[in-house]
């Protein structure tokens, strides 16, 4: 079984569209877990209406409400509640194409016995146009083939997120579907006073132990909302500097291209100066002294952020 998980905060009006895409799935053995991160809109009544209309036909709809703490804390709750072997995060403003879960399950049936594989990863598509977002796999690389029961083949390559991103140069949005057990092994840190944690912090930690099977298929359709987390990313990072600096500090320890490390060092200092003086003294997220040469540049960008954001 798959757990489709939706964290939501004041986005109740968008849930019906996602619900309709789940009803259209060709594969039906899944549960839909919604974790409401303390919404003040009518999310509760909207979910209750969906549940009464749906009556658990095909798949159950499970709703949990918690105090506001940020998307990452909602993910932690969802992972604890999940009954599925795989955990698919579907944001309230996005949808799944009808064959998404079917494709994932068919690939997973031939993958799950390999304990080095922590999940499946496909590509995102544009909800409004349907096209691939990003570069896809570069031409000329060797892709493996999976023969599925319906006589279709799927191209794939096994590798960590960093190998695919930085080694092969794949750009754009991808959708990771993890083993639920892997996310239980790597929960998001919940830091007092912070409501944001970059997902890449955990995805990188997962990549230090597990590969993903990256398939050449669109399994997720996205539409960015003007009030969404993507458009407010700088503000979110400024307001949650401990988790943010932790993310960039860990990036500096990985085997990644130098230009990415330099960018990470600059961003570390950029958000380090969002910490209070007391928290700077207490800061346990340290980086090697070689990266101190980027302190001044990071500070300049920090000052610009304060004027723009």
Task: State where each predicted segment sits.
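Short, well-formed alpha-helical segments that are part of the catalytic scaffolds
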Residues: 11-24
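A conserved acidic beta->alpha catalytic loop
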Residues: 21, 36-46, 91
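Short beta-strand/loop segment that forms part of the nucleotide-sugar
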Residues: 29-38, 62-66
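Glycine-rich, basic loop-to-helix element that forms the pyrophosphate-binding segment
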Residues: 65-82
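Short aromatic/hydrophobic "clamp" motif used to bind/position activated sugar donors
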Residues: 87
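Conserved donor NDP-sugar-binding/catalytic core segment of glycosyltransferases
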Residues: 99-141
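Conserved nucleotide-sugar donor-binding catalytic segment
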Residues: 130-231
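C-terminal subregions of glycosyltransferases and related glycan-biosynthesis enzymes
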Residues: 213-309
């Amino acid at each position: 079984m798959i757990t489709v998980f939706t964290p939501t905060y004041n986005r109740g009006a968008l849930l019906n569209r996602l619900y309709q895409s789940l009803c259209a799935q060709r594969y039906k053995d899944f549960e839909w877990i919604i974790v409401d991160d303390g919404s003040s809109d009518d999310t509760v009544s909207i979910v209750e209406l969906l549940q009464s209309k749906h009556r658990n036909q095909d798949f159950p709809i499970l709703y949990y409400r918690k105090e506001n703490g940020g998307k990452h804390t909602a993910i932690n709750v969802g992972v604890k509640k999940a009954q599925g072997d795989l955990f698919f995060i579907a944001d309230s403003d996005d949808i799944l194409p009808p064959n998404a879960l079917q494709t994932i399950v068919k690939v997973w049936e031939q993958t799950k016995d390999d304990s080095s594989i922590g999940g499946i990863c496909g590509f995102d598509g544009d909800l409004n146009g349907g096209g691939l977002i990003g570069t896809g796999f570069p031409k000329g690389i060797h892709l493996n083939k999976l023969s599925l029961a319906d006589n279709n083949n799927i191209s794939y390559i096994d590798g960590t997120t960093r190998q695919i991103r930085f080694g092969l140069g794949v750009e754009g949005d991808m959708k990771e579907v993890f083993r639920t057990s892997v996310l239980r092994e790597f929960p998001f840190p919940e830091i007092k006073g912070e409501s944001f944690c970059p997902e890449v912090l955990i995805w990188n930690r997962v990549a230090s132990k597990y590969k993903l099977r990256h398939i050449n298929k669109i399994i997720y359709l996205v539409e960015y909302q003007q009030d969404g987390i993507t458009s407010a990313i700088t503000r979110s990072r400024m307001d949650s500097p401990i988790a943010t600096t932790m993310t960039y500090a860990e990036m500096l320890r990985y085997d990644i291209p130098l230009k990415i490390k330099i960018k990470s060092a600059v961003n570390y200092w950029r958000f380090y100066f969002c910490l209070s003086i007391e928290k700077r003294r207490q800061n346990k997220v340290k980086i090697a002294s070689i990266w101190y040469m980027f302190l001044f540049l990071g500070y300049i960008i920090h000052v610009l952020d304060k004027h723009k954001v």
